[in-house]
C-alpha cells in the first residue's frame, strides 16, 4: 500500500468542501488610509480574486462570498449606488475570466431588488458559466439567512398544499430542498474578517455545523496566505494533523 503523506491526506479528505466568507472591513480599511469607503470596496475586489484563485487551486468545491446583505440597503444612498455600479463593473470584467477557469458563477439572494439592467447582467453571467464543472462561486447579494429560510418555507407551503401533506410528513430535507444552495454541500468553514465575531444573518441554515474562523484582518488585506492559514486552522480543528499554512500554500503551488 502506498504511503499516505500529509499532502495526500489534505488533498483527498481534509479540505472543506464549502467555504463561506463574510467580507468585512472595507470601510474601516479605507478610513485608516484616509480614503472614502468606496476606495475600500474597490480594493476588496482584488481580495476576492485572490480567494477565488486560491480556493480553485486547492480544489475547494464551493466558495460563497457575502457581498451585499439585505440590511445594506440602509447605508447612505450614494454608497449603495456606488456598490451597485461596482457590482455591475466586476460582473462585466470578471465573468470571462471565471468562465476561462471553468468556474461556475451563481448569484444567490433576492435578485428582484436590483435594477433590471443589473438583473440582466446577472442572468447572462450565470448562463455563460452554467455548464462549468469546477469551483462553484456563489456571490450572496441582497441576501439574508432569514430571507433564505422564509423563501424556502414558502416553496414548501406550496408543495404541502399541492400534495395534501400533513405536519408529520415534513422533513428537514424538504425544507433544505428549497434553499438557495439546495444542490450544494452545507458550509464546512465560515470565515469573517475585520475582527467581528458574529455571522450577521449569513447562511443560517447551511452553516449549522460550520467551523467559524474570525480574523482581525480587514478584507482588502486578506490574501492567499490568509486563506491558507484559515484552511490550515480548519484542518487542525477537524483532523488534528498539525497542518500549517505553509503546507497549504505548497499545495496551491502544485
UniProtKB/Swiss-Prot annotation:
Keywords: Cell shape, Cell wall biogenesis/degradation, Magnesium, Metal-binding, Peptidoglycan synthesis, Transferase
Catalytic activity, reaction form: 8 isopentenyl diphosphate + (2E,6E)-farnesyl diphosphate = di-trans,octa-cis-undecaprenyl diphosphate + 8 diphosphate
Residues that coordinate or bind Mg(2+): 24, 211
Source organism, top-level taxon: Bacteria
InterPro entries (UniProt xref): UPP_synth-like, UPP_synth-like_CS, UPP_synth-like_sf
Gene3D superfamilies referenced in this protein's UniProt entry, alphabetically: Decaprenyl diphosphate synthase-like
Listed cofactors: Mg(2+)
Gene Ontology MF terms: ditrans,polycis-undecaprenyl-diphosphate synthase [(2E,6E)-farnesyl-diphosphate specific] activity; magnesium ion binding
Residue positions of the active site: 24, 72
Record EC number: 2.5.1.31
Pfam families for the chain: Prenyltransf
Keyword rRNA processing carried by entry: no
CDD domains, A to Z: Cis_IPPS
Binding site for substrate: 25-29, 37, 41, 69-71, 73, 75, 192, 198-200
Transcription in keyword set: no
CC cofactor note: Binds 2 magnesium ions per subunit.
GO biological process, any: regulation of cell shape
GO cellular component, one term: cytosol
Annotated family: Belongs to the UPP synthase family.
Function: Catalyzes the sequential condensation of isopentenyl diphosphate (IPP) with (2E,6E)-farnesyl diphosphate (E,E-FPP) to yield (2Z,6Z,10Z,14Z,18Z,22Z,26Z,30Z,34E,38E)-undecaprenyl diphosphate (di-trans,octa-cis-UPP). UPP is the precursor of glycosyl carrier lipid in the biosynthesis of bacterial cell wall polysaccharide components such as peptidoglycan and lipopolysaccharide.
Subunit structure of this chain's protein: Homodimer.
Record protein name field: Ditrans,polycis-undecaprenyl-diphosphate synthase ((2E,6E)-farnesyl-diphosphate specific)
